[in-house]
């Protein structure tokens, strides 16, 4: 078990990539706090999986876009856990549209939920991590291939994910000497609820453009997160790990 005796906080844990990360962590011996906006359909299954692996799963609730609310909930979870060895900032939304038509509220919502929440949650958790003794801790931030290369119709999303990449690199330089690793994962075209709404012909075009000729699965991202959360990656920090089927090649 790669994460035996570790405690992890995962945001956006109720579905898709977040749920897959929680599952991978539980299977590898971590006790996990999953943060989502409301009680999820996955809760019972995740609690069962945790029990089968001799660990615990705790589902907690907050709107990550509400600074006061998410701060209160994360601080309470941290008090319960004592410390988090791993933080995965995965929660995110899209509000797509051409830039010249985009409403300011759509820009603000995406930046607040996708980027500002990463700062707020990491600030709380990293402050505790740097006081940990004789062990390394890991912060894993979910970026996107769009944050590296841009995408028309997603200027707000691209800005938020590009911001996550820059933030991760800067924070890695701040906390590395205290044993805290900070990395970002940049998924490509992954089969999730977020991509399921795309038209079939658009999805086919995306897949055809990939060297691997297939869409990724949430488990592909979860495997990368598992590696970064484990002691297999203790000399990796400030990096962006592309999990994109070759999209960024």
Report each predicted region and the residues it spans.
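C-terminal substrate-recognition "lid" of short-chain dehydrogenase/reductases
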Residues: 2, 214-243, 248
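Conserved glycine-rich cofactor-binding loop
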Residues: 14-16
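Conserved glycine-rich Rossmann-like NAD(P)H-binding loop of the short-chain dehydrogenase/reductase
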Residues: 28-44
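Substrate-binding pocket helix/loop in short-chain dehydrogenase/reductase
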Residues: 98-99, 103-111, 206
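Active-site helix of classical SDR
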Residues: 122, 160, 168
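Alpha-helical segment proximal to the catalytic Tyr-Lys
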Residues: 127, 173-177, 234
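Residue(s) in the substrate-gating loop at a strand-loop-helix junction
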Residues: 144
């Amino acid at each position: 078990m790669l994460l035996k005796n570790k405690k992890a906080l995962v945001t956006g844990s109720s579905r898709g990539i977040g749920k897959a990360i929680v599952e991978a962590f539980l299977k590898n011996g971590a006790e996990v706090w999953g943060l989502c906006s409301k009680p999820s359909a996955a809760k019972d299954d995740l609690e069962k999986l945790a029990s089968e692996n001799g660990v615990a799963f705790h589902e907690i609730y907050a709107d990550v876009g509400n600074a006061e609310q998410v701060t209160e909930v994360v601080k309470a979870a941290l008090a319960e856990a004592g410390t988090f060895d791993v933080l995965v900032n995965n929660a995110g939304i899209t509000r797509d549209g051409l830039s010249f038509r985009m409403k300011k509220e759509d820009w603000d919502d995406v930046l607040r939920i996708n980027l500002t929440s990463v700062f707020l949650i990491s600030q709380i958790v990293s402050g505790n991590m740097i006081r940990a003794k004789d062990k390394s801790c890991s912060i894993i931030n979910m970026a996107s291939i769009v944050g590296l290369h841009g995408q028309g119709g997603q200027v707000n999303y691209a800005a938020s994910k590009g911001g996550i990449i820059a933030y991760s690199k800067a924070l890695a330089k701040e906390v590395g000497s205290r044993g805290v690793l900070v990395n970002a994962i940049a998924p490509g075209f992954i089969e999730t609820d977020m991509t399921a709404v795309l038209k079939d012909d658009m999805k086919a075009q995306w897949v055809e453009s990939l060297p691997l000729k297939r869409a990724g699965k949430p488990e592909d991202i979860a495997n990368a997160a598992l590696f970064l959360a484990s002691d297999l990656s203790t000399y990796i920090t400030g990096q962006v790990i592309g999990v994109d089927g070759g999209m960024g090649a």
